[in-house]
Amino acid sequence: MDDYHVNTAFSMGRGNQQDDGNSESNSMHTQPSTMAPATLRMMGKSPQQQQQQNTPLMPPADIKYANNGNSHQAEQKERQVELEGKSRENAPKPNTTSQSRVSSSQGMPKQFHRKSLGDWEFVETVGAGSMGKVKLAKHRYTNEVCAVKIVNRATKAFLHKEQMLPPPKNEQDVLERQKKLEKEISRDKRTIREASLGQILYHPHICRLFEMCTLSNHFYMLFEYVSGGQLLDYIIQHGSIREHQARKFARGIASALIYLHANNIVHRDLKIENIMISDSSEIKIIDFGLSNIYDSRKQLHTFCGSLYFAAPELLKANPYTGPEVDVWSFGVVLFVLVCGKVPFDDENSSVLHEKIKQGKVEYPQHLSIEVISLLSKMLVVDPKRRATLKQVVEHHWMVRGFNGPPPSYLPKRVPLTIEMLDINVLKEMYRLEFIDDVEETRSVLVSIITDPTYVLLSRQYWTLAAKMNAESSDNGNAPNITESFEDPTRAYHPMISIYYLTSEMLDRKHAKIRNQQQRQSHENIEKLSEIPESVKQRDVEVNTTAMKSEPEATLATKDTSVPFTPKNSDGTEPPLHVLIPPRLAMPEQAHTSPTSRKSSDNQRREMEYALSPTPQGNDYQQFRVPSTTGDPSEKAKFGNIFRKLSQRRKKTIEQTSVNSNNSINKPVQKTHSRAVSDFVPGFAKPSYDSNYTMNEPVKTNDSRGGNKGDFPALPADAENMVEKQREKQIEEDIMKLHDINKQNNEVAKGSGREAYAAQKFEGSDDDENHPLPPLNVAKGRKLHPSARAKSVGHARRESLKYMRPPMPSSAYPQQELIDTGFLESSDDNKSDSLGNVTSQTNDSVSVHSVNAHINSPSVEKELTDEEILQEASRAPAGSMPSIDFPRSLFLKGFFSVQTTSSKPLPIVRYKIMFVLRKMNIEFKEVKGGFVCMQRFSSNNVAAKREGTPRSIMPLSHHESIRRQGSNKYSPSSPLTTNSIHQRKTSITETYGDDKHSGTSLENIHQQGDGSEGMTTTEKEPIKFEIHIVKVRIVGLAGVHFKKISGNTWLYKELASSILKELKL
């Protein structure tokens, strides 16, 4: 496979950039046989061009032609491009350098976009930011899913650009370029530090980084995939959340911060955008790009982070220790959770700075006194008076409803001694670039360990440990000795903490290898003993005359009197528990989140045991489901609820049907009413068919242990009966909507959503269709904004009753569905540009024109519900992929009244498209929803800055507090004076050593005032998705937003505006 040339000798920050360029230019003759040969252009320069260079530089950005494997055509194209380049060199040169750049850019070939990384195939882009993009990847053999973060190698890109520039004119120009080069080198160091820290951290609320690959132009980091989305999406759905749910999220964040601070690590960029939610509603902290290692005896001087979540000492450019900055950011995050907005906000950045420095917070009336008490202790301007993390986790609001503070999940550690120092751990620290020299680091560790203070703390540790072990021997709990004195195993020194983390990572890897070896040997023993065991079983059971399969017939020739077990009437043996390995029993390449949708409860129990706050003997192992996990009926018990809520049955049906009578290799039997239900797919049709009925699902064989043969088989003409019943149901729905529209005309405008639902279901005898009585609440107390969600109940169960024509199997071929949480807009293979809307594919339809009728609603005239349903009933199957292929989703507490609707899905689809057109938002309808993009021209941006509040035009999530190393360095995109107040409110520092800087945010702010001549360029567009999902339990249609790229807080306001316009 033709690929980038991989420079295995590359090492960032070791002063060998020049050797790197020479090694790449000569490596085509010394390349290993396992690597694909790189072409001359992929190597950067041809030999003739390389000889003309006076100073060796790194090669330019690698490129590759889309030749579909035809290397001969690629070589011809390269020769042709080289000849064109030579002809341009011989041609007379223009007077201006700009014209030469334009001519050279026109001759540049198309840039290569990678589609895979080893065995991982890129599926789609799920996020983008200033540092790079995140792609979803699927393993081609194991079908595991992971998130691949792709970051440009800043130094390589900078040196490539330098080649295109004229040589420096004077010494000052040389110094300026050298400063820029050092800044790019520090960016690469920051990326490598993020990867190194991510590999050694191991916590259930921290997104795991499994591997990092360094290629010629990019860093590829393989993270576990958290499919639940960002916490920001959760807040958009609700505006704000209830305190008991916010407490659960806050305890997860606090647990992760305890673990980080106990290992001398400070995050420094904690914000809503960097917190993800898994399918089990557990949080995961991501993005350690700005994290650093702190020492409690010293202070940091790097001022970084996002403005809205940055502590006042960062804005004042005061030095800090580290943990207090995370406590402030934690307080802002908690405020956003319970209030739905940031505590400090203003359209003028100068006023916003002053508000943050003053720290005056206004709390909404619906907040409890306890949470206000906690927030008032965290959002304190003076870091010395601010609550510590220990005080936060022990606050009565944080422990309400729980047995105590959140656990830290730190494994059991003991104080180090000289004899315990392992050279292999030091070498691993060197490989991860935490240290520069192994022997020097060992000397530093020895000096720390032999220090009298550390020796005294170690003796106290063992004394108190022995005492508390004796006291806790009755209940078996581990001693908690951190409250009595300073624990030498927690945040004593950063070098010791990194040694602990690296050692624990190696222990986990070694334990995993041992488990794999033991499993393989155990499986081999089982295979060898399989034949005699089966013979013994047949000696005890029934006759062999009922045997039909070949393996049993072969065994029957040895002993004709062997009885046969009556459990499987078709005669097949169930050796699956021996031959098929467990789902998580795979190599180190398994990168699926342990809280993903496919995981079972057994996996979660083992993960909780592995990462329990009480140290266990096997804390360093990576746990997985063993090959024999007990009775398979136990799996069916905890799997039933998930099979009801989603239609993804797949392997679960196979596993549970193996042990049921007359069910092996046979379709699931269904009653006549089951035939029109959407819970079990009929025949070979896809399970995502858009046929919505409210029939109660019948328990199948895979969800019950008994009553296997109670239901009769389907008749031969079942499909025709189903089609007739569907057509009849459609006619009834249309007639019913006639009556509904007549009734709605008589309802007052201010009657509210519940009155509307009551009118729709008036005359029904079912009590659950009537709206619930209003809540009895005292008038002196304001309700939480989401409290009205409890009043709907089952009164709005109408949207799933409308049925679209069935999808023919030929229109969309059936394939294995991978629910990644994102829509199938496979545009990554065509272009990585955010501004390009790709052409029509099999899974999507092109952007709709304004003049279309039902498929693209016109802004001038809005159709009535009756007209929409009539058009939808006549529309061919597959013409509305957003509702023809809906998703079944139910995340606990994820949907509210504002994001759910009782109306039929065609009406929901039409309203979404109508609002998008009305708001001039580009969109593309795909399976399950819409991919949308909001562009901002310079006029729109200027108008928004003048007329919109600060909350609508906030800073981007990547426009963080940054310290400029030089006043002469201008940003890549020039801005107006007002925009510099908003975009350059921070101090970015190169992510290297923390050195004191006299540059403060005020100085940066003054620098922005002097740039009167700058003009505004087009703002980065916002790309997001709108999912149309089926909320099964309550029988409603839901709308779910997911951000892909762009300004985070502007996206939040845009999504909120869309929800208000929808009026679901």
UniProtKB/Swiss-Prot annotation:
Tell me how the protein is altered or processed after translation.
Answer: Autophosphorylated.
Q: Which residues form the active site?
A: D269
Keywords assigned by UniProt, alphabetized: ATP-binding, Cell membrane, Cytoplasm, Exocytosis, Kinase, Membrane, Nucleotide-binding, Phosphoprotein, Serine/threonine-protein kinase, Transferase
User: SUPFAM superfamilies under this entry?
Assistant: KA1-like, Protein kinase-like (PK-like)
Question: What EC number(s) would the UniProt record show?
Answer: 2.7.11.1
Residue ranges under compositional bias (Basic and acidic residues)?
74-91, 598-608
Q: InterPro entries of this UniProt entry?
A: KA1/Ssp2_C, KA1_dom, Kinase-like_dom_sf, Prot_kinase_dom, Protein_kinase_ATP_BS, Ser/Thr_kinase_AS
Gene3D superfamilies documented for this protein:
Kinase associated domain 1, KA1, Transferase(Phosphotransferase) domain 1
Q: Where in the cell is it found?
A: Cytoplasm; Cell membrane
Q: Which SMART domains match?
A: S_TKc (SM00220)
The record lists the catalysed reaction(s) as: L-seryl-[protein] + ATP = O-phospho-L-seryl-[protein] + ADP + H(+); L-threonyl-[protein] + ATP = O-phospho-L-threonyl-[protein] + ADP + H(+)
Citing just one GO molecular function, the answer is: ATP binding
Segments for region (Disordered): 1-113, 549-621, 652-672, 694-714, 762-797, 823-843, 958-1016
Q: Where is the composition biased (Polar residues)?
A: 8-36, 93-108, 557-571, 654-670, 832-843, 963-989, 998-1016
Q: What is its main location?
A: cytoplasm
Keyword Transferase found: yes
Query: Per the UniProt entry, what are the Gene Ontology biological process annotations, in alphabetical order?
Result: exocytosis; positive regulation of exocytosis; positive regulation of IRE1-mediated unfolded protein response
What is the protein's membrane topology class?
A: Peripheral membrane protein
- Segments of skewed composition (Basic residues): 779-794
The record's family statement is: Belongs to the protein kinase superfamily. CAMK Ser/Thr protein kinase family. NIM1 subfamily.
Q: Note on file?
A: Present with 279 molecules/cell in log phase SD medium.
Give the protein's recorded name: Serine/threonine protein kinase KIN1
Q: Which organism is it from?
A: Saccharomyces cerevisiae (strain ATCC 204508 / S288c)
Classification of source organism: Eukaryota, Fungi, Dikarya, Ascomycota, Saccharomycotina
